[in-house]
C-alpha cells in the first residue's frame, strides 16, 4: 500500500486539525487487513514534508490558536496521535523520502522501519531555530536512528543534512538517484 502526503502547495506541511484522526484511521485499517503486507509513505511534489505549518504557528491559528493549555491539548490530540498511529503499525513502514523532510516531517520519516531517499532529499530538525521544543517524539527517535552525538548536533544547531550525509549516518538505508522528478522512489 502506498500513502502519499498530498499537500504539495504547502510542501506537505502537517498537521491539519483532522490529520490525527485520519492517520489513526488509516493505520487501524492497515492493521485490520491481513492482505496488506507493507506501507510505503512518500510525499507529493518536491517535498516529503516541510513539517509544521510555520504560517499557522506565526498567525496562531488552527492547531496553534488559543491558550497554551488549548494548544498543548490539540498538539496531543493531533500530532502525538499521528506519531503513535505510525509507531503502532503492525506491518513494515517504508519511508520513501522524495525531498526535504524537516521537523515533524523528518520525525515521521524516521519512524520508517526502512528509510530510502532521493538524492534530492534533505533532513533537519529546525526547532531551536524557531525557539520551540521538539514535541513530537523526534528527540527520542533521532538518537536511536543516528546515535546520540549526531542527533544532539542536529537538535542543538538546527542544521540540516543532505541525502548523502543521511545515508552515511544511517538515517536512510540507501539513496535513489532520480533523473525524472515524477519517478516513484519505491520502484
Which residues does each PLM region occupy?
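Single conserved hydrophobic/aromatic residue that forms the stacking wall/gate
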Residues: 176-187
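Glycine- (often His-adjacent) and acidic-residue-rich active-site loop
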Residues: 10, 14-17, 43-82, 101
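CoA-thioester-processing core
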Residues: 82-88, 96, 102-156, 169
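Hydrophobic/aromatic residues within transmembrane alpha-helices
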Residues: 41, 53, 108-110, 166
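Short, glycine/polar-rich helix-capping loops at beta-to-alpha or helix-loop-helix junctions
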Residues: 159-164
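Conserved CoA-thioester-binding segment of acyl-CoA-metabolizing enzymes
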Residues: 1-44
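Short, flexible helix/strand-to-coil boundary loops that buttress conserved ligand/catalytic motifs
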Residues: 15, 52, 58-61, 127, ...
Amino acid at each position: 500500500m502506498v500513502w502519499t502526503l498530498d499537500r504539495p502547495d504547502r510542501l506537505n506541511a502537517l498537521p491539519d486539525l483532522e490529520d490525527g484522526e485520519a492517520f489513526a484511521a488509516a493505520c487501524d485499517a492497515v492493521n485490520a487487513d491481513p492482505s496488506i503486507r507493507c506501507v510505503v509513505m512518500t510525499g507529493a511534489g518536491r517535498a516529503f514534508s516541510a513539517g509544521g505549518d510555520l504560517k499557522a504557528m506565526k498567525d496562531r491559528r488552527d492547531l496553534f490558536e488559543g491558550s497554551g493549555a488549548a494548544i498543548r491539548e490539540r498538539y496531543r490530540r493531533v500530532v502525538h496521535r499521528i506519531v503513535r498511529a505510525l509507531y503502532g503499525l503492525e506491518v513494515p513502514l517504508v519511508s520513501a523520502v522524495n525531498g526535504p523532510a524537516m521537523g515533524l516531517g523528518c520525525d515521521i520519516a524516521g519512524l520508517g522501519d526502512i528509510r530510502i531517499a532521493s538524492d534530492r532529499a534533505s533532513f533537519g530538525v529546525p526547532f531551536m531555530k524557531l525557539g520551540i521544543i521538539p514535541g513530537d517524539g523526534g528527540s527520542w527517535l533521532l538518537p536511536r536512528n543516528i546515535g546520540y552525538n549526531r542527533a544532539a548536533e542536529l537538535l542543538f544547531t538546527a542544521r540540516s543534512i543532505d541525502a548523502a550525509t543521511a545515508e552515511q549516518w544511517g538515517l536512510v538505508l540507501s539513496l535513489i538517484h532520480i533523473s525524472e522528478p515524477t519517478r516513484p522512489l519505491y520502484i
